[in-house]
Amino acid sequence: MIMPQTRLVVADNTGAKEIMCFRILGKKKVAQVGDIIVASVKEAVPRSNIKKGDVVYAVVIRTKRTIKRKDGSCVRFDDNAAVIIDKEGNPRGTRVFGPVARELRDKNFMKIISLATEVI
């Protein structure tokens, strides 16, 4: 459950380390895995393309909140993480760190799925 003011770890190599959500796209109060958010960069690597204070679009790939699946299984991650995307929905980075949830496949984020090392 990602709400406005929630800080997320950035799980790609764009140069941002941490972002803060301030808007959830669509008529939703909270964002789950696979939802697109608008966020502000709070911490970034020096000399990177993305600077502190930039407004970016991101897709949530991991949440601490338990994800209940149709088959009865539950999945929970250690952190809240997102991948920065452009307006078309393509990831801006070329690598995705850590596992991603399988729910991204249902939302048609195939490029992120292909870059991920592990899909759970």
Curated annotation (Swiss-Prot):
Any single Pfam family the record assigns to this protein: Ribosomal_L14
Q: Kindly give the SMART domains that the UniProt entry links to this protein.
A: Ribosomal_L14
Q: Where is the signal peptide?
A: none
Q: Which GO terms describe its cellular component?
A: cytosolic large ribosomal subunit
Q: Which keywords does the record carry?
A: Ribonucleoprotein, Ribosomal protein, RNA-binding, rRNA-binding
CDD domains from the xrefs? Ribosomal_uL14
InterPro entries associated with the record: Ribosomal_uL14 (IPR000218), Ribosomal_uL14_bac-type (IPR005745), Ribosomal_uL14_CS (IPR019972), Ribosomal_uL14_sf (IPR036853)
Q: Which GO terms describe its molecular function?
A: large ribosomal subunit rRNA binding; structural constituent of ribosome
One GO-annotated biological process of the protein? translation
Query: Do you know which PROSITE patterns this protein is assigned to?
Result: RIBOSOMAL_L14
Q: What does this protein do?
A: Binds to 23S rRNA. Forms part of two intersubunit bridges in the 70S ribosome.
- Self-association state and partner proteins as the record states: Part of the 50S ribosomal subunit. Forms a cluster with proteins L3 and L19. In the 70S ribosome, L14 and L19 interact and together make contacts with the 16S rRNA in bridges B5 and B8.
Family designation: Belongs to the universal ribosomal protein uL14 family.
Write the protein's name.
Large ribosomal subunit protein uL14
Q: What's the encoding gene here?
A: rplN
